[in-house]
Amino acid sequence: MKTKTTKKTIKKAAKKIKKPSKRKIKKTAKKSRPKKPIKASDHGLIFAKTKKETTEKEDAELANAKAKTKKRRETRSSDPTQIYLRELGFQPLLNAKEELKIARRVHKGDPKARKQMIEANLRLVVKIARHYVNRGLPFLDLIEEGNLGLLTAVEKFDPERGFRFSTYATWWIRQTIERAIMNQSRTVRLPIHVIKELNVYLRTAKKLTQEVDHEATPEDVAHLIDKPVQEIRRIMDLAPSATSIDVPISEDGQKSLVDTLADDNNIDPARLIQNVDLQDHIERWLAQLDERHREVVILRFGLHENEKGTLEAVGKAVGLTRERVRQIQIDALQQLRHILEMEGVTGEEVED
């Protein structure tokens, strides 16, 4: 009896519970559906990006980026400088032991070792050449000139002196690059010692012109730098070729050839006009010295269009210590003095 009564009670309670209408079920279903993308209207609503639209735009941007990258690579691949630098990246560097071993083979005349030593140091040339960019020569020309200095260094390097080759080669590389800038950046070729003399005159004349109301005269310049007026007039005869000194040589026009010349105010330059016969005599006198003494004299006193070198710089160039260069210089000058005496030539005659 109790069981039947309980069932009847449950049925009555169930009937009292209201079932949701079909209309309410539909409304609930509509609310649970995902919202559709908002459409743009004339009132400036933002477009809702669908997944498909976003993917298409990203693909287009990626394709555009790839095209630009490909174009840059093609440009780099056709650039001679980039090609050369990329090739250098594959050249192995030498450690101290390898360098010493190969340098000894070069000293004995091994052509394969010579090639290996050159190729291993081409990057050193590029590194040094970068310091001379925008000074009148293209970058590849600077590298080419530096490579000539590297060849000279390889030929002259003595591995038994205790120097690293890079230290020795740097001097020769810089020397050839600087000489090329002086020689090739001019419309008229002049010897290095003449350019230096001309440099002193130009700087002095420019300074005087700024201080006085008229253009500096040879007498003004001669008085200021303590030189004979006649010598200054000889410099003025070079005026047609000297005018190119102030021509801008950098791309931005901020640097002229005169800016690339060293300031030699503290150096007593060689005479501008040297007698041809005297030059011949000097060559003959130098030829009577041995190779090492002759090389030290040439580098120390700036002969053969070289710059005057300090004892330390010459020592690096020939692979000797500073003191040893000084000793060789003294000995070489004594030999030259003896040669002059044997020919009856005095120091005063040479100076005149």
UniProtKB/Swiss-Prot annotation:
Q: Which GO terms describe its biological process?
A: DNA-templated transcription initiation
From the UniProt record, list the coiled-coil ranges. none
Q: Which residues bind DNA?
A: 311-330
Stretch list, region Sigma-70 factor domain-4: 285-338
Cite the SUPFAM superfamilies for this sequence: Sigma2 domain of RNA polymerase sigma factors (SSF88946), Sigma3 and sigma4 domains of RNA polymerase sigma factors (SSF88659)
Q: Which Pfam families match?
A: Sigma70_r1_2 (PF00140), Sigma70_r2 (PF04542), Sigma70_r3 (PF04539), Sigma70_r4 (PF04545)
For the region Disordered, what residue ranges are annotated? 1-78
Q: Where in the cell is it found?
A: Cytoplasm
Give the residue ranges of motif Interaction with polymerase core subunit RpoC: 141-144
Subunit details for this protein?
A: Interacts with the RNA polymerase core enzyme.
The function of this protein is: Sigma factors are initiation factors that promote the attachment of RNA polymerase to specific initiation sites and are then released. This sigma factor is the master transcriptional regulator of the stationary phase and the general stress response.
Q: Which family does it belong to?
A: Belongs to the sigma-70 factor family. RpoS subfamily.
Q: What is this protein called?
A: RNA polymerase sigma factor RpoS
Q: In which organism is this protein found?
A: Coxiella burnetii (strain RSA 493 / Nine Mile phase I)
